[in-house]
A protein has these predicted regions:
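N-terminal subdomain of nucleotide-sugar transferases
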Residues: 1-126, 130
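Active-site proximal beta-strand in glycosyltransferases
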Residues: 3, 166, 183-210, 214, ...
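Histidine-centered beta-alpha loop that forms part of the nucleotide-sugar donor binding/catalytic region
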Residues: 8, 39, 194-197, 263-264
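Short N-terminal targeting/anchoring amphipathic segment
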Residues: 101, 158-176, 185-191, 195
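An amphipathic, basic-hydrophobic alpha-helix
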Residues: 141-166, 176-178, 226
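Membrane-proximal helix-turn-helix segments that form the acceptor-binding/catalytic region
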Residues: 153-163, 197-198, 215-238
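Carbohydrate-associated surface elements
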Residues: 244, 265
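Acidic anion/phosphate-binding donor-loop and adjacent secondary structure
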Residues: 250, 256-257, 266-274
């Protein structure tokens, strides 16, 4: 069996609770082959691992959310097909998002992120969103914010995906998008384990952030909610550590029947002399 662990901002780059849990889990299954799909901010972390990888880790794939699409910058621009444009518009307006069409667009076609983000189709879809929800804002600011929001998601859409029997995402967010896309492409199973609730953590960060103001905070938060809802919908099983976290997952769109609460284990024998 081949298992792909999909992790954002932790293993194998950073030491921490989630990273240690992943490392221990891999070592507990020495006869299972693991592949790591690790998401980092940029290439400064390339190959800089905080852990010595176990022998049953066969490959590590790295995705950088702040990567730049220079290699295809000067390709001839092409308009999207009607189905592709409808899917793009559904994503931006968050109206019955056609994720699988978008996965196929970026995985099966030689598209340039620059051409998508700077093209007429993206402009038209953003304009529709602006007119429906945000016409009180300055349009140029809104447009560039939307480009900033969708660049890391579109980079994620283009990621080369290792084939595996099971994709285990240790958060929703971009990891959940990758797992959902891999499920669509390979027909594999998807498992999501949340130690913290990704959407709530990003929401708290954005509320405190100085780099984004006013209603733009809400637009970013909605983007993370959208991605998390995808992961919940596509997963076969979603785990959380306690009941309150389970309730948050339900509020964020996870079907209750998919959720299992798996509290952190305690070695009782270590406490018997207390």
């Amino acid at each position: 069996m081949r298992v792909c662990i999909v992790a954002e901002g932790c293993y194998p780059f950073v030491v921490g609770g989630v990273s240690s849990w992943i490392h221990s889990m891999i070592r507990l299954f020495p006869n299972t082959e693991f592949v790591i799909l690790a998401i980092a901010a940029n290439r400064s972390l390339r190959g800089k691992y905080a852990y010595e990888l176990p022998e049953n880790v066969s490959e590590v794939y790295e995705l950088y959310l702040q990567d730049v699409d220079w290699s295809k910058k000067h390709r001839r621009r092409q308009r999207l097909k009607k189905e592709q444009y409808r899917a793009l518009r559904s994503l931006i307006l968050d109206q019955d998002v056609q994720w699988n069409v978008l996965f196929d667009l970026f995985q099966k076609n030689d598209v340039s992120l620059n051409d998508i983000l700077m093209g007429e189709d993206f402009l038209h879809a953003v304009t529709d969103c602006y007119n429906l929800k945000y016409s009180q804002l300055v349009f140029s600011d809104f447009l560039w914010t939307m480009r900033s929001i969708y660049l890391p998601l579109f980079i994620t859409f283009q990621m080369e995906l290792p084939k595996a029997d099971l994709y285990h995402c240790v958060a929703t967010g971009y990891a959940g998008v990758l797992g959902s896309m891999a499920k669509h492409i390979y027909g594999s199973r998807l498992l999501v384990s949340e130690h913290g609730i990704y959407t709530r953590e990003r929401e708290e960060e954005l509320i405190k952030a100085k780099w984004v103001n006013g209603i733009y905070k809400n637009i970013w938060i909605d983007q993370f909610r959208k991605m998390s809802k995808l992961a919940y919908q596509e997963s076969s099983l979603v785990t959380s550590l306690f009941e309150q976290a389970r309730q948050l997952q339900i509020e964020l769109g996870c079907p209750p029947e998919k959720i299992a609460v798996t509290p952190n284990g305690i070695r009782v024998e270590n406490l018997q002399n207390i």
